[in-house]
Amino acid sequence: MKDFYKLYSVGKSTKKPYSRGKSFGYQVLGFGSGFSSAIAHRSVWGGAFQPSKSNVIDFVEIATAGNATDFGDLTVARFRNSSSAASSTRGIFFGGNSDPTRLNVIDYVTIATAGNATDFGDTSAVSQHGGAGNNDTRAVHALGDVSDSAVNTLEYVTIASTGNT
């Protein structure tokens, strides 16, 4: 299982054969920094550093321990802690790094149906290492690192519709 990371219920992954957490399963591809969107029954994450950027989106069914399954592809391969948010039906992925450039891309997926991400719109600036929070209607995105310096910019989108921040 050279290219797989083991998932643990404590929210960590490892290639080690032991851990303090209870085994959950394996990811389709290993990751260094990715992101996730979760609703009551499914966790979805995309992008990776394995050892390079990735456009792969994986998911697991939260109620059932087991290996991750390929969900689809992001519109742009990326890594470096893009941020994400989700409503009960849609997951959104903000920004990241496509090496050598930061991204302003926003992608979305319908969480209940596996498939490729679709372009949602753009953030106001290229960024990486951002953060996001949400309720079922709105996602708030903190830009994070813009041009090698942190910024204090918050932006939002309405999850059910597409468009720029």
Spans of model-derived segments:
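Polar, enzyme-active/binding microenvironments
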Residues: 1-165
